[in-house]
Amino acid sequence: MAYEGKNLETIALHAGWRNDETTGSVAVPIHQTTSYQFNDTAHAASLFGLQEFGNIYTRIMNPTCDVLEQRMAALDGAAAGLAVSSGQTASAYSIQNVARAGDNIISSSHLYGGTYNQFKNNLKEMGIEVRFVDPTDPANFEKATNDKTRAYFAETLPNPKLQVFPIGEVAEIGRKHGIPLIVDNTAAPVLCRPFDHGAAVTTYSTTKYIGGHGTTIGGLILDGGNFDWGKAGADRQPALNTPDPCYGGVVWDEQVTKNMGLPFAYLLKLRTTLLRAVSYTHLTLPTI
């Protein structure tokens, strides 16, 4: 069901789930399964070969989590979403999906302390350089950019400074150079929709306002479907535009965007490589 034009309250309550067709239940069920039945070997081959999209294994997808992913995508105006185990996982994955050892990203220096430490130390151990800049001047992102820059990163309302990040200005600079802006929107879900201002990817810690009551830890990554990875090219974005040995040599933008006709090559790459192999897996949440 399309939710374009619906009230946010309606989207928050109903996106991604109507009712169980067999029982009529309006509550989202918890699918406690690891595996899924394929119709036949051809169906399995089609799923694994990225000819069609569907459930393969709960490490990378689950119908319960799918409701959360669809609901948040609808609220944010995203093409697709991916639930992961925590907000820190979402931040790390969002970068690792495009940057490799020897690459760099440009990040706002106004960050939550856990993210700052992750970027400064953990990503450094993986060979990914993070260049921190003062976000009050968008031009600082462009000044720090070189031919190895793969992404820009910032928080909408950084913890703890709460100084609003200039999403539109930095996103425009990024697109000029073929660089996506990734925005951690944990502090302002629904109130701010970064995709409306040009961001390519958003991340969330669902533990905060989305959960709302301190009982559930989780994270989300949303793909706006609005970034032209093919136009960015193989020199700027090799992770999406060159053969990926992690999944049989597939070229993600070519296969997902052009062959499958889906606008979320970034997210499908993340789901079928990082989530499958490294697996800070998403959770089957007890409540949506």
Regions found by a protein language model. Name each.
Residues 97-115, 134:
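Conserved PLP-anchoring active-site segment centered on the Schiff-base-forming lysine
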Residues 157-180, 189-193:
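Active-site core of PLP-dependent enzymes with the aminotransferase class I/II
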Residues 117-169:
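PLP-dependent aminotransferase-class I/II
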Residues 281-287:
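Conserved small/polar residues in nucleotide/adenosyl-binding loops
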Residues 204-217, 225-246, 273-278:
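Active-site PLP-lysine loop of aminotransferase-like
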Residues 35, 40-92, 114-122:
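Conserved N-terminal alpha-helix of the aminotransferase class I/II PLP-enzyme fold
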Residues 24, 72, 90, 105, ...:
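Buried hydrophobic positions in well-ordered alpha/beta secondary-structure cores of metabolic enzymes
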Residues 1-55:
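N-terminal glycine-rich, Lys/His-bearing helix-loop that initiates the first secondary-structure elements
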